[in-house]
Structures are given as structure tokens and as C-alpha cells.
């Protein structure tokens, strides 16, 4: 997912776990991670400002993302609408998890 890769540095502030045993910083590229209710709140604290920033973007722009662990970067053309819709989806899932006092399970990119 291009947007997740673009904001990946700030998403490393989220603490997740794998199999309730291995603590992770951020989200894995492969496999699953469990996100506690407290960390869901932190996700919202990170995503909402990103959404506000993208609301000020041009209608069409590029996200510059790193290709896997290589030094290579590439530009991915996106629209403001698709970025905002994706972020609103993330916010909706997080809001629902908080309302239900649930954890989230994340499947890698």
C-alpha cells in the first residue's frame, strides 16, 4: 500500500505485537500484528494530522516511496480524493475498534 509506505516512519511510533510474544515498532511488511486499544488511539493521533495535511494538497500529486529495503525511490501518482478516502477508512476502523473496546489485527503490506 503506497500511502502506508509513505507515512511509515511515523507509524513506527505504534507498538504492535506478533502472537502476543514479539513486540514490534510499527507494522510488518509481511505477516500479522496485533494492535492494542491504547495503540489504536495513538494511530488516530497520527493519522488525523496526516489527513489534515493531505486536505491541503493539490488534487493530483505524487507520493515518493521507498522500494522495499532498497535505496531506490519511486513516485506514485495519486489523487487527493483517493488518499483522503483511504485515511477515512483507517479512521473508521480505528473508531469502531475503540467503540467496541477491541484490538485490531493488521495484515502486512
Predicted regions and their residues:
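Acidic (Asp/Glu-rich) sequence patches and key acidic residues
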Residues: 1-103, 107-109
